[in-house]
């Protein structure tokens, strides 16, 4: 029943049941040859479960960093797309507003409102793959009808 301490430094290993060495009491499990000096995991201020928590924390931080990076990239990409398309959208809005103003008070006004809704005006059919506007037949149709 001797402690495996060397030069006054305890490594927490003992070969028999609890033993008092000097003024220090050593506790350990009889089933383990490499036992802790702590009676339970709660006695260890560093927490024996730290190595199992570290990968989980690392995964959480990695995932959050990935999500933050994606969000930043999407925001900057969306802003660039907005800046490029703003002029086109503004021009279409002015054209639709002009048509609606010219048809105000006429029987054609209700038909113009139905046809010139935003989903029709900004439909993919009016744009190529690079989102450059082709001829906008709907706007041209209404402009020709009003001339």
Swiss-Prot record:
Start-end of Acidic residues biased regions: 40-51
Pfam family, one: Yae1_N
Localization of this protein: Cytoplasm; Nucleus
Biased composition (Polar residues): 28-37
Domain of life of the native organism: Eukaryota
Keyword hit for tRNA processing: no
Region (Disordered): 28-53
Region feature deca-GX3 motif, mapped onto this chain: 65-105
Cellular component terms (Gene Ontology): cytoplasm; nucleus
Secretion signal, residue range per the UniProt entry: none
Any Gene Ontology biological process: protein maturation
Assigned keywords, A-Z: Cytoplasm, Nucleus
The keyword Nucleus is annotated on this UniProt entry: yes
Assembly notes: May form a complex with LTO1.
Family: Belongs to the YAE1 family.
Biological role stated in the UniProt entry: The complex LTO1:YAE1 may function as a target specific adapter that probably recruits apo-RPLI1 to the cytosolic iron-sulfur protein assembly (CIA) complex machinery. May be required for biogenesis of the large ribosomal subunit and initiation of translation.
Name of the protein in its database record: Protein YAE1
Species whose genome carries this gene: Meyerozyma guilliermondii (strain ATCC 6260 / CBS 566 / DSM 6381 / JCM 1539 / NBRC 10279 / NRRL Y-324)
Gene name per UniProt: YAE1
């Amino acid at each position: 029943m001797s402690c495996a301490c060397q030069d006054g430094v305890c490594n927490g290993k003992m070969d028999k049941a609890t033993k008092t060495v000097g003024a220090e009491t050593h506790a350990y499990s009889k089933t383990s040859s490499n036992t802790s000096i702590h009676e339970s995991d709660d006695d260890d201020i560093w927490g024996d479960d730290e190595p199992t928590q570290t990968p989980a924390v690392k995964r959480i931080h990695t995932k959050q960093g990935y999500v933050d990076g994606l969000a930043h990239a999407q925001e900057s990409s969306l802003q660039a797309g907005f800046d490029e398309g703003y002029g086109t959208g503004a021009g279409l809005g002015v054209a639709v507003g002009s048509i609606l103003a010219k048809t105000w008070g006429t029987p054609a006004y209700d038909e113009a409102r139905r046809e010139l809704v935003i989903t029709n005006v900004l439909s993919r059919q009016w744009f190529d793959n690079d989102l450059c506007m082709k001829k906008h037949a709907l706007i041209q149709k209404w402009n020709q009808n009003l001339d």
